Amino acid sequence: MEQLSGVVHVDRENLTVVGVRHVTLDEFWVRGHIPGRPLLPGVLMIESAAQLCSYAGRVLIPDMGFIGFARCDDAKFRGTVVPPSTLYVIAKMVDVSRRRIVAECQGVCNGNLVFECKITGMPV
């Protein structure tokens, strides 16, 4: 289940990537995740961040292979994402080893911070 529309920026020097997710009214969750007032579920925001971290691991650390989701820590939700809108996800690698990557992630929608978390990934 693809949760990113694309990657818009890669900064190899600072181990940072920015992804974009276009949130539309025809997504599978819209009808049921708060009827009459659709809100992008927090778990899908986290999944967007995890997918971006997997991409970042492959691009920024090529010999690491595929990075799978291992853990999410310190998740905080500070706003809502209502379709139609665009969610930007930023991931900065803060710890990289052969066994794992750790990234600090943020989601921004309409210029507002809507979530932040720390994602850990591991080669699978």
Identify what each model region corresponds to.
Residues 1-40:
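Catalytic strand-loop segment that frames the active site of acyl-thioester-processing enzymes
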Residues 5-8, 73, 79, 105:
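Residue-level detector of beta-strand structural context in well-folded domains
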Residues 50-90, 114, 122:
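Hydrophobic beta-strand-centered segment that forms part of the acyl-chain substrate-binding groove
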Residues 31-56, 69:
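Compact, glycine-rich, soluble single-domain proteins
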Residues 8, 20-22, 76, 92, ...:
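Generic structural detector for well-ordered beta-strands
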